[in-house]
Amino acid sequence: MKLCAVIIASLLVCVAVASSSDNQKEFAQEKEMTREETQSLGEHEKDDEVTGSEERSCIEEWKTCENDCECCGMSTLCAASWVDGHEIKLCRNEGGKLKKVLHFIQKSVSKIKSCKK
């Protein structure tokens, strides 16, 4: 019974830590300066003129990309892989926080089962 209480408490702590780190990331993103606030606004306007004619859309999973902003979905990242000595960046779905929590629970349960034997 005590072991179950310890496991549940540790799971709650892990979930709390994971949610607080996401809140810190959101806070940091809110504090970043916008384009209008930067000193190099003229450079950004030139970039907009050049790329203004391009129609932008998101890139699907497992297609090549340059940065995270191009990939479709909230938990999709532009991750680099090395193939034959060349770096290839592909959009990959990382699954988000829920997938990580479920994976942690699965590992915990398997460790408990192995301890009982």
From Swiss-Prot:
User: Record's GO cellular component, any one?
Assistant: extracellular region
Q: Which residues form the propeptide?
A: 21-56
**Expression sites by tissue:** Expressed by the venom gland.
Instruction: Spell out the residue ranges making up region: Disordered.
Output: 20-55
Compartments where located = Secreted
Q: Name one GO molecular function term.
A: toxin activity
Q: Kindly report the protein's main subcellular placement as a broad class.
A: secreted
Q: How does the entry describe the domains?
A: The presence of a 'disulfide through disulfide knot' structurally defines this protein as a knottin.
Q: Indicate the family of this protein.
A: Belongs to the neurotoxin 03 (Tx2) family. 02 subfamily. HNTX-XV sub-subfamily.
Q: What name has this protein been given in UniProt?
A: Hainantoxin-XV-4
